[in-house]
Amino acid sequence: MKYSTIILAFVVLFSCKNPEDEYHTPENALDAGREFIQQSLKGNFNTAGKYMLQDKDNQYWLDRFSKEFSSKSEHEKAQFSKASINISEVSDVVPDSVTVINFSNSFTKVPQKVKVVKHNGVWVVDFKYTFSGNL
């Protein structure tokens, strides 16, 4: 009886997931961009990567961004995690396939942009655009 209680406790403990950290298929470009940004602010780069177009350039930039984030102080990480996303403009560059989201976060207030594309019917972030600016 004692062992079954312990096993049950472990099953319950390890089956609990934070629903905010899980991947949800985005319904539109804004959903994909917002989820990518939010997961990045929280330091959840594995989850953020699920909202990103999978290519070597994007993976390079996500890895670099992740390393930079991990070098920040715990205080800074907490501030990023609590930050809200302030979207200033959403531009449908190519309707139903390419959208650019201009945003900042409430911690740094630095204007940034992400490009979101529809790839194989799913909205994903083309992260390299953030650094190159090329459509």
Regions found by a protein language model. Give the residues of each.
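Exposed beta-sheet edge and beta->alpha loop/turn motif
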Residues: 84-135
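Bacterial lipoprotein signal-peptidase II cleavage site
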Residues: 17-24
